[in-house]
Amino acid sequence: MSWRGRSTYYWPRPRRYVQPPEMIGPMRPEQFSDEVEPATPEEGEPATQRQDPAAAQEGEDEGASAGQGPKPEADSQEQGHPQTGCECEDGPDGQEMDPPNPEEVKTPEEGEKQSQC
């Protein structure tokens, strides 16, 4: 007697209906207007201090880009397609060239061998 194992076919399970959550109410922008208002500067603080963080942030951005150094520029075709030594190149328009006419192709002699793609 051989053991047949568990069947891989499963009957589709009945779909359970899930009721959508109840809506609390419409979302209104007026509810959030108090939280969105920017803080007003105090009398003791000059208004120029509020602009300093923006200037400091610009300075940090310049330093970060200078620390990365120049990016090496390489030909994208060389990175995307490694050459194996037997590569057929595309035509000048980037489209493949039509195969040559068989009547015009010369057959190589037995002594000569050509690599074919």
Swiss-Prot record:
Belongs to the GAGE family. This gene belongs to a family of genes organized in clustered repeats. They have a high degree of predicted sequence identity, but differ by scattered single nucleotide substitution. Their sequences contain either the antigenic peptide YYWPRPRRY or YRPRPRRY which is recognized by cytotoxic T-cells. Residues 1-117 are annotated as: Disordered. Residues 32-45, 87-96 have a biased composition (Acidic residues). InterPro entries: GAGE, GAGE_fam. Expressed in a variety of tumor tissues but not in normal tissues, except testis. This is G antigen 4. Antigen, recognized on melanoma by autologous cytolytic T-lymphocytes. Signal peptide: none annotated. Residues 103-117 have a biased composition (Basic and acidic residues). It holds the Pfam family GAGE.
